[in-house]
From Swiss-Prot:
Family: Belongs to the G-protein coupled receptor 1 family.
Subcellular location: Host membrane
Keyword Disulfide bond: yes
Name used for this protein in its record: G-protein coupled receptor E1
SUPFAM superfamilies registered for this protein in UniProt: Family A G protein-coupled receptor-like
Amino acid sequence: MATTSATSTVNTSSLATTMTTNFTSLLTSVVTTIASLVPSTNSSEDYYDDLDDVDYEESAPCYKSDTTRLAAQVVPALYLLVFLFGLLGNILVVIIVIRYMKIKNLTNMLLLNLAISDLLFLLTLPFWMHYIGMYHDWTFGISLCKLLRGVCYMSLYSQVFCIILLTVDRYLAVVYAVTALRFRTVTCGIVTCVCTWFLAGLLSLPEFFFHGHQDDNGRVQCDPYYPEMSTNVWRRAHVAKVIMLSLILPLLIMAVCYYVIIRRLLRRPSKKKYKAIRLIFVIMVAYFVFWTPYNIVLLLSTFHATLLNLQCALSSNLDMALLITKTVAYTHCCINPVIYAFVGEKFRRHLYHFFHTYVAIYLCKYIPFLSGDGEGKEGPTRI
């Protein structure tokens, strides 16, 4: 009887332990399921800064150290390449436009301002390289953070406005060739460029104020910092403004302009007019190819709580997509000089003349064998 009682006690204890374990597993499963239905939230150490610093709705933490680590290891090297090639290319564009093409019409003025916009953006890249490489530890002070963020957005908006104005300029030149001559003068060009930069600066004013703050550990983070009571409202309004100005507005204007231009060229084919719009058309297409993916992913990242119900793993994938598309978008600032060299016939001719006149002479002076007329030069050998 004693043995039976002991066995019964052991079985009861084992059954209780099993039931407790199963109940704990079930409770854990339920909590996990409920948590997965709630939108995830970003860690304060996330990579995304400035344009793409997305703060998800209040929920259980969703840490994404893999994205942060990848950004710190890869992005600074890519930004360095973009900085070097972009700086060289856009400086060449500025020199050639001023030295050879002359600032005598609206088109050349806008091309010059487009290069200056790219240069302004490029000059901020070394700071972002350092910031990302240091895992978001800003060491240059809050004032410089605000200034550089504002300059970033101002260069983006001025670039968009310049491309829009180049499209409108081509539209006027093709559709209203004679009438447009009154508006495509140097004076109108100067007024247009001044208004462009003023409007870009005005639209960038919030970025000069709502960036840079010090966390509880004393670290300065150069990220968007909005009033606590309405952080999500400010952030969504900011992203909506960026997407409207950098994607929707230029897309609508350029679609209408090129629709009318193509209809006119189909009715009255003109090789000269075709050449006149080819360069600007390629510049426009390149802009959308590089910036559209980023804008779409940014939209999903910001409004995903309303549009989608993402689990942490899917949210991490979205952040990785944001990292990739942002890097591609930043690469655009070194693309325009390449387009000019391959598509712009006049630019290519002036570029060749510049290298032949200034670069080749110095290379031959300091590297004699490049000139092909050294002392040991021999005549052709006859067989």
